[in-house]
């Protein structure tokens, strides 16, 4: 695997660039890309500050004390990204990774009732055998659904997924009036009602306008996620 220098790591990682050594932990291949993920070791050491050194963070992780989306992760390089649920098993603390205007991504504490819930954005669909469709989500997850159900779910829509039951609880279409949050780009973390979509030949580059009170922000369709019909269905901000 190619090494990763601190100076070339994603700018929002909470690590010093010119101190602490030359190299940073490079996320292993997984559900999120390098640009939009942070290694589990840095979550434990630099974000939550449960460890002072990488050695301590690796020890905590290797002992099975950390769950991501309800699964024990022992790989300290595991990539943690948007909407992932991080649980500290010994303390019972649970956090969700959400877009944040100050730190790009932030971990916000959530209740145990929300721990099994995760918002997933639809990235595409593929036809499979048996007349069914496979729906692809932003975190690398794939679900095979009956064609009638999957046809109602469009690219850019969101679903509220039950991690424990492994089922879709609800469907949130990407349409005017929906409540959405900016997940990437210069306006990351801003959330509000989707009031305008200017469609372009490249759908992902379509310009959208989000409004919250008197404040409004423009970005592209590829940079937003629907999080509720009129209000967020889960906690999305600190």
UniProtKB/Swiss-Prot annotation:
Keyword Nucleotide-binding in record: no
SMART domains, sorted: S4 (SM00363)
Gene3D superfamilies in the record: 2.40.50.740, RNA-binding S4 domain (3.10.290.10)
Pfam families the record matches: Ribosomal_S4e (PF00900), RS4NT (PF08071), S4 (PF01479)
Single GO BP term: translation
GO molecular function: rRNA binding; structural constituent of ribosome
Protein name listed in UniProt: Small ribosomal subunit protein eS4
């Amino acid at each position: 695997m190619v090494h990763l220098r601190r100076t070339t790591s994603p700018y929002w990682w909470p690590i010093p660039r010119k101190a602490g050594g030359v190299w940073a932990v490079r996320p292993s291949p997984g559900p999120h890309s390098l640009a939009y993920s942070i290694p589990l070791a840095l979550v434990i050491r630099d974000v939550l500050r449960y460890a002072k050194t990488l050695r301590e963070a690796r020890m905590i992780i290797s002992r099975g004390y950390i769950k991501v989306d309800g699964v024990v992760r022992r790989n300290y390089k595991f990539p943690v990204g948007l909407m992932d649920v991080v649980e500290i098993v010994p303390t019972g603390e649970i956090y969700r990774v959400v877009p944040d205007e100050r730190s790009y991504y932030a971990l916000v504490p959530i209740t145990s009732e929300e721990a099994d819930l995760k918002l997933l954005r639809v990235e595409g669909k593929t036809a499979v055998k048996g007349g069914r469709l496979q729906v692809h989500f932003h975190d690398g997850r794939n679900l095979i659904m009956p064609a009638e159900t999957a046809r109602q779910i469009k690219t850019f829509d969101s679903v509220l997924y039950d991690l424990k039951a492994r089922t879709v609880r609800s469907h949130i279409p990407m349409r005017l009036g929906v409540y959405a949050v900016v997940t990437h780009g210069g306006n990351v973390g801003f959330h509000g009602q989707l009031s305008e979509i200017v469609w372009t030949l490249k759908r992902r580059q379509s310009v959208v306008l989000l409004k919250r009170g008197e404040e409004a922000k423009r970005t592209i369709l590829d940079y937003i996620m629907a999080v509720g019909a009129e209000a967020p269905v889960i906690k999305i901000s600190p």
